[in-house]
């Protein structure tokens, strides 16, 4: 016989007058004038249980229970007395009069109250089992489950096949570091945990599976941020015989379907599309948050001949940029606010933050308030006011440096101001969801340290057809058939059309200074497969953790993963990673070298 007949949170008026069996945990026990009330919790919610002293044996047991005891109760569902209804609970109109109470397992005193919202992350992750009992974590993980289910439903309906790819694979150290797994059988050799199923899913397209997907773990040994984990989950997809636009349309519909069916959000009927170059020019980011109603103004050309070296030097540098950020009504900002923003942009490499307050635009330079106005000639001031569209009461911030520093610092300032209380009060940020596609990424980035080009995405991304000739003559001019889906400033998915011809893939390897011998050693299996009539193909991978984090309104992806790692890639619950037995190391033919101690 089942230990329970109902979930606690689902006991409502439809069960009035019925006897139910419930199992769960004691959220709270209260003794009110000889009657004991127990808030009993399971995954569906709470129900109030009333323990009357008329049943002596049951009541004695109730007197001994404490928070987080695991118990079973049997009792009668009845209406709560008038004036005691709890509108905040699904079960708030009823209570269960307890007839039997069995303690299934006692609990030691928990290290924290489950309703404490001020717990440190260290405490939460160390006691993750208890943390997961909290309603918000229950909600987050069930939301994650629903997102995965809806993704599967959509992909199944579109003819995709769920195929598993290997977790032990070949190390191809391009980009992030691999997690390496030593082979006991093949001494001195290593597997790598996959950073993505990229090459295997391409091979599946060559193998005529046409449409593939899996929801899979991926691994990257990199420095962590709030939105990164050493192991993360992707909704990984690949399809044959579709062009870039068709692929984007297919997966845009999937994301629209997931948001509608899981959190009842209607995303735009058609996502806007923005070239990478435009995103960087307007927002300083390839994942712009379109909720923030602030944009850059380009001033590099207008500052080349000013006496102000802070502006003219980067304006005349090959990799320099001068840009402005106009903040409507920003004249209200105090000097303390401005000083705070100045310190903030230093985090991103900026040396300072120039600014101009527009008091009376009609008066020209006399109507401007700023320590830099005296260093700018009339033509440059006119360009600033005209291009920014500044009005009385605005403030204009400036960044002048290498383009990367300008983009990073002014882009971060844009978000900080937009999402601040000032920004919210003055309509500088909109509510809701703002998706877009960013396309036409550079194929390569130049690595000054190694004096060579590296792949901006990965080396299997196809260049645009009209840029194929640049692979051998000017790789820096190549644009890729790559696309990222961005939502509210987060990249939630990224993909590309792949190279499906061996000769093009070999040209890309040469552009990356990967010689024929090295290419054969690392990627020979792919080059061989491409010679057997590989179809045109492409795909995308979505970050499941990121999507659920946004839907849940969580602060970190650690809040939507059952057992996450810290920012130091540690599991505080199991204390992993940890030392291993010397015998295990000998079996793997591994000897540890202690890290060198820093010199005094």
Curated annotation (Swiss-Prot):
Q: Its catalytic activity?
A: tRNA(Asx) + L-aspartate + ATP = L-aspartyl-tRNA(Asx) + AMP + diphosphate
- Pfam families on file: GAD, tRNA-synt_2, tRNA_anti-codon
What Gene Ontology cellular component terms go with this record?
A: cytoplasm
Q: Where does ATP bind?
A: 220-222, 229, 491, 543-546
Q: Does the record bear RNA-binding in its keywords?
A: no
User: Annotated region Aspartate: where?
Assistant: 198-201
Alphabetic keyword roster: Aminoacyl-tRNA synthetase, ATP-binding, Cytoplasm, Ligase, Nucleotide-binding, Protein biosynthesis
Molecular function (GO) terms for this protein are:
aspartate-tRNA ligase activity; aspartate-tRNA(Asn) ligase activity; ATP binding; nucleic acid binding
- Hey, where's the site called Important for tRNA non-discrimination on this chain? 32, 83
**SUBUNIT field:** Homodimer.
Q: What does this protein do?
A: Aspartyl-tRNA synthetase with relaxed tRNA specificity since it is able to aspartylate not only its cognate tRNA(Asp) but also tRNA(Asn). Reaction proceeds in two steps: L-aspartate is first activated by ATP to form Asp-AMP and then transferred to the acceptor end of tRNA(Asp/Asn).
Concerning HAMAP family, the annotation shows:
Asp_tRNA_synth_type1
Please state what the protein is called: Aspartate--tRNA(Asp/Asn) ligase
Which gene name belongs to this protein?
aspS
């Amino acid at each position: 016989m089942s230990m329970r007949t109902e979930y606690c949170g689902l006991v409502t008026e439809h069960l009035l007058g019925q006897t139910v069996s419930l199992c769960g945990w004691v959220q709270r026990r209260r003794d009110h004038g000889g009657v004991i009330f127990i808030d009993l919790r399971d995954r569906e919610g709470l129900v109030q249980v009333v323990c009357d002293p008329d049943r002596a044996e049951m009541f004695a047991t109730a007197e001994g229970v404490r928070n987080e005891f695991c118990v079973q109760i049997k009792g009668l569902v009845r209406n709560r007395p008038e004036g005691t209804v709890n509108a905040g609970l699904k079960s708030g109109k009823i209570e269960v009069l307890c007839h039997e109470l069995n303690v299934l397992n006692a609990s030691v005193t928990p290290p924290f109250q489950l309703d404490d919202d001020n717990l440190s992350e260290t405490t939460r992750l160390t006691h993750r089992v208890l943390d997961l009992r909290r309603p918000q974590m229950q909600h987050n993980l069930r939301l994650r489950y629903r997102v995965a289910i809806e993704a599967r439903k959509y992909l199944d309906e579109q003819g995709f096949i769920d195929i598993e790819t290997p977790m032990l694979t070949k190390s191809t150290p391009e980009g992030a570091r691999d997690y390496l797994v030593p082979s006991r059988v093949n001494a001195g050799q290593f597997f790598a945990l996959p950073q993505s199923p990229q090459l295997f899913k391409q091979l599946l397209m060559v193998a005529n599976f046409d449409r593939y997907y899996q929801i899979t773990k991926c691994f990257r040994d990199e420095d962590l941020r709030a939105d990164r984990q050493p192991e993360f989950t992707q909704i990984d997809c690949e399809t044959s015989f579709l062009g870039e636009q068709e692929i984007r349309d297919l997966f845009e519909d999937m994301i629209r379907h997931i948001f509608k069916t899981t959190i009842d959000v209607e995303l735009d009927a058609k996502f806007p599309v923005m070239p990478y170059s435009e995103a960087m020019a307007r927002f300083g980011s390839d994942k712009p948050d379109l909720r923030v109603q602030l944009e850059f103004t380009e001033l590099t050309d207008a500052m080349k001949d000013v006496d102000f070296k802070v502006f003219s030097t980067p304006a005349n540098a090959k990799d320099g940029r001068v840009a402005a950020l106009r903040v409507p009504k920003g004249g209200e900002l105090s000097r303390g606010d401005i000083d705070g923003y100045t310190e903030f942009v230093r985090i991103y490499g900026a040396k300072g933050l120039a600014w101009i307050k527009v008091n009376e635009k009609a008066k020209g330079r006399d109507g401007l308030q700023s320590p830099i106005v005296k260093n700018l000639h009339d033509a440059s001031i006119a360009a600033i006011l005209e291009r920014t569209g500044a009005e009385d009461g605005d403030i204009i911030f400036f960044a002048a440096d290498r383009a990367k520093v300008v983009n990073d610092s002014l882009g971060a300032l844009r978000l900080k101001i937009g999402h601040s209380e000032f920004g919210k009060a003055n309509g500088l940020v909109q509510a809701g969801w703002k998706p877009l596609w960013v396309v036409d990424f550079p194929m390569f980035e130049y690595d000054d340290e190694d004096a060579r080009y590296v792949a901006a995405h990965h080396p299997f991304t196809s260049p645009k057809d009209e840029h194929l000739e640049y692979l051998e003559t000017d790789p820096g001019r190549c644009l890729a058939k790559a696309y990222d889906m961005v939502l509210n400033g987060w990249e939630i998915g990224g993909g590309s059309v792949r190279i499906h011809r061996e000769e093009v893939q070999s040209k890309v390897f040469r552009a990356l200074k990967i010689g024929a011998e090295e290419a054969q050693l690392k990627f020979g299996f792919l080059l061989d497969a491409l010679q057997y009539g590989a179809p045109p193909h492409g795909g995308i991978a979505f970050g499941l953790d990121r999507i659920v984090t946004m839907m849940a309104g969580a602060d970190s992806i650690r809040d939507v993963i059952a057992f996450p790692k810290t920012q130091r890639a540690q599991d505080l619950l199991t204390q992993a990673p940890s030392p291993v037995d010397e015998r295990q190391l000998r079996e793997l033919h591994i000897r540890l070298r202690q890290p060198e101690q820093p010199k005094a």
